[in-house]
């Protein structure tokens, strides 16, 4: 298994700092391109609420802001295993967040009120 260095994590943080809210696809692509160039294993995680329109098209992350982080029901991040922990890096988490916590923090209407999960 390839280990990721502190310097490489700092580079990922720099990449992420270039992306704003609603730019998760572009951010994930930039991180993925960097990981490939460094031969660091990672996995692109694509979430979908099941609806690109209507109230389920809005995804929120309560740890980020009160504004929606997605308007089309989709959000993406990159999973990197660091010290045997699945960490997610996206345009809102430059320091990374555990995959479990990331999935808990991301909300949409039917998840909040009806227990639906991402597809």
Where in the sequence are the language-model features?
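A structural boundary/capping signal
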Residues: 1-119
């Amino acid at each position: 298994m390839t280990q990721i260095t502190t310097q490489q994590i700092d580079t990922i943080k720099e990449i992420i700092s270039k992306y704003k809210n609603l730019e998760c696809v572009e951010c994930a692509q930039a991180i993925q391109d960097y990981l490939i160039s460094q031969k660091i294993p990672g996995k692109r995680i694509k979430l979908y609420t099941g609806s690109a329109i209507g109230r389920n098209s809005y995804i929120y992350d309560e740890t980020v802001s009160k504004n929606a982080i997605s308007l089309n029901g989709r959000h993406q991040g990159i999973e990197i295993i660091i010290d045997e922990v699945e960490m997610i890096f996206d345009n809102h988490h430059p320091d990374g967040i555990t995959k479990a916590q990331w999935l808990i923090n991301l909300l949409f209407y039917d998840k909040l009120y009806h227990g639906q999960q991402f597809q």
